[in-house]
């Protein structure tokens, strides 16, 4: 099986696919900017995956089925999305937001390709920053009084079963998608991360997180390794030169705001609703 993945490992849905590929021991190529075909159809939406040079697909739950995992039920997928609440706080500190994204290393072995992609990747980060703030301004999402509540359905489910993972003796779609959410929360720490660490009601969730981190101890895209046991190293960064290229690109995006901002909204309209 030949797999090409477009995406950045800050996305929970990209993480779910990468975790699935790692679990199945399937080699893949990861690119940090969208292929032209993907850009024309879906903008910068991620992940996008092509299997054996077939058509690109963007629904992570469906991609996991193609990789050999059982489908996730609609109500479970909704519970995964509920656990993603709080994502809007990623942009509370713009400097931290851009600094953390600058550390996402492109995987190409070619210096020229890495440099080009890290420059262009700055637009995707600019897009994400604009999108999150646009949603905050228009929808004005309210913080819950208790961030831990969004995990209680998972806690109850885990406590009622005997297996190490939600889907049995090995991780399945529910495990991969939910663990992807945790990676997103940990990549730029947001308020929903804290109850996973210390809420007395979420003992089972911490046991599950420990099981996942042991299972994926050699997974190269894990951000939660600094927050839960056993500890796992953070993803390897791109190096100072490539970070500098990213920030040069980011400065260019802001300098060209009359062009880049309208482009962001054009690409937003391509995202399926």
What are these regions (language model features)?
Residues 1-122, 166, 248-273:
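GST-like domain detector, emphasizing the conserved glutathione-binding G-site
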Residues 32-35, 171, 222-227:
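Acidic carboxylate-rich catalytic motifs and surrounding loops in phosphoryl-/glycosyl-chemistry enzymes
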Residues 90-207:
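GST-like fold's C-terminal all-alpha helical module
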Residues 149, 193-241:
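Juxtamembrane amphipathic/hinge helix adjacent to a transmembrane helix
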Residues 238-251:
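Membrane-penetrating hydrophobic segments
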